[in-house]
């Protein structure tokens, strides 16, 4: 296993060094590895550069580490979402600016991809990468390192020159079928090992659906090659000794042949628990024999983004699923003895009190069919570049216009922590929250319930 002993890990290559910085979120650390960099780093190394990953979530002294590593680096890469993680992202950029104005700052991730001009306006970035950057980041690094012009035909890369933002705003396609394995050698894996020894894994990038609240569907879909995902899964289980896998693909169960191949692999390894995300149509995508084999192979939980119990709202979200589908999937999983983990969204733009009551009704129905179901509540968070973000704006939502503003918005699942729900009329919101609180009381997120023992994930074994 990779050990860092409190020090950052750096690959040794012949050219200059690049630091990749991962910011801190508001919610409690959930043991996710810094996946964007695990995918990007091999391509940077392949181009001959040294790579150092600093993850502020697991490094209490990340500022000192960053200053040390930047002393002999020529570029700093930063990824971020549209929320509290921007605070440490901005701080990292400022540290680099204060140390040496020649350090090239390169931003990527959902927020920079959605609102690149805001990032440039505050002088936190020299380059912004739109969408996946495995094939563009090394090209730009090479040009910066050699002090050459950026190739004019490169897509999905923006930069500022004489006060103007130049480059291509064409978002790069999602590509995941390359042979390069994730750069686990650049992190201390033990810092991401949870009590239940579970590791997250992505077999697919992108999503074929276009749910109006989600930013993932803005890109196309690409799958890891069979040989590659089998090799990587074996490495995680047999070499790194993880005993539970959480497949985080948005629609992991969509392709039955691939899922059964994964189930057969895990069954052959033995003593591995696993879970994945599914659509409501899960109940009709597999035969009874396939369902039973998945259970035998270690499937312990299936996650659903149900979102709403109102068919009107589901259609508005373009979910392409029927309310009844979730009830049927709940029955299938209950009969198999597999946990159903269902997530719901509240305070959706355009949602009515009647819609809320239909959602609560569906939750009761699901609980009756599957008594061991875990119900997760989330409050709608407008994500830039999504249709539902634009819907919220049309209904009165005034989004932040600066990185500082975005960094201060809460991603909490508690109404008392949210003061930005301006897309609902005050009188409606007041009644909405009363009905919600009467039903759920003092709501706790899954992480909070695990901490107090109110919820024990089947992934614990």
List each language-model region with its residue ranges.
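Radical SAM enzyme core and accessory elements
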Residues: 1-21, 29, 45-46, 50, ...
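N-terminal [4Fe-4S]-dependent radical SAM core
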Residues: 2-14, 18-19, 25-26, 154, ...
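A short helix->loop->beta-strand "cap" motif at the edges of active sites that frequently abuts
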Residues: 16, 98-104, 125, 272, ...
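A short, glycine/small-residue-rich beta-strand->loop->alpha-helix junction that serves as a flexible
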Residues: 25-35, 81-86
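Flexible glycine/acidic-rich beta-alpha junction loops that bind and position SAM and/or redox cofactors
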Residues: 27-28, 116, 209, 256-257, ...
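Glycine-rich beta-alpha loop elements in corrinoid/cobalamin-binding modules
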Residues: 40-170, 381, 385
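Catalytic cores of alpha/beta
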Residues: 116-122, 350-365
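Radical SAM [4Fe-4S] cluster-binding motif and immediate context
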Residues: 176-340, 361
């Amino acid at each position: 296993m990779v050990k860092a002993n409190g020090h950052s890990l750096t690959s040794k290559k012949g050219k200059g060094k690049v630091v990749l910085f991962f910011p801190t979120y508001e919610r409690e650390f959930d043991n996710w590895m810094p996946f964007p960099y695990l995918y990007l780093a091999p391509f940077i190394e392949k181009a001959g550069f040294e790579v150092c990953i600093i993850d502020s979530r697991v490094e209490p002294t990340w500022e000192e580490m960053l200053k040390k590593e930047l002393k002999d680096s020529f570029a700093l890469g930063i990824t971020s979402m549209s929320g509290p993680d921007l605070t440490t992202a901005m701080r990292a950029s400022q540290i680099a600016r204060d140390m040496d104005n020649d350090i090239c700052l390169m931003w990527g991730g959902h927020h920079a991809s959605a609102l690149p001009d805001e990032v440039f306006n505050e002088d936190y970035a020299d380059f912004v990468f739109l969408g996946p950057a495995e094939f563009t980041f090394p090209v730009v690094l090479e040009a910066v390192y050699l002090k050459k012009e950026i190739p004019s035909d490169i897509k999905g890369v923006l930069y500022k020159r004489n006060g103007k933002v130049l480059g291509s705003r064409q978002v790069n396609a999602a590509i995941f079928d390359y042979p390069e394995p994730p750069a686990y050698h650049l992190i201390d894996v033990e810092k991401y090992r949870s009590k239940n020894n579970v590791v997250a894994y992505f077999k697919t990038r992108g999503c074929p659906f276009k749910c109006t609240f989600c930013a993932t569907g803005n890109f196309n879909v690409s799958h890891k090659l069979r040989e590659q995902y089998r090799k990587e899964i074996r490495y995680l289980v047999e070499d790194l000794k993880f005993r539970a896998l959480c497949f985080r693909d948005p629609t992991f169960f969509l392709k039955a042949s691939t899922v059964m191949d994964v189930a057969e692999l895990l069954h052959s390894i033995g003593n591995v628990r696993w879970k994945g995300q599914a659509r409501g149509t899960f109940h009709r995508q597999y035969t009874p024999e396939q369902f039973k084999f998945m259970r035998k192979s270690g499937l312990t939980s299936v996650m659903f983004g149900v979102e709403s119990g109102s068919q009107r709202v589901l259609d508005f979200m373009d979910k392409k699923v029927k309310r009844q589908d979730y009830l049927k999937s709940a029955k299938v999983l209950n009969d198999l003895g597999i946990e159903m983990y269902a997530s719901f969204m509240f305070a959706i733009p355009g949602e009515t009190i009647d819609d809320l009551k239909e959602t609560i009704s569906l939750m009761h129905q699901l609980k009756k069919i599957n008594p061991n179901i875990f119900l997760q509540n989330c409050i709608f968070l407008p994500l830039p570049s999504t249709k539902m973000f634009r819907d919220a704006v049309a209904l009165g939502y005034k989004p932040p216009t600066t990185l500082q503003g975005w960094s201060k918005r809460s991603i909490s699942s508690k109404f008392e922590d949210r003061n930005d729900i301006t897309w609902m009329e005050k009188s409606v919101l007041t009644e909405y929250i009363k009905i919600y609180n009467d039903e759920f009381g003092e709501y706790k997120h899954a992480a909070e319930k695990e901490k107090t023992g109110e919820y024990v994930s089947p992934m614990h074994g």
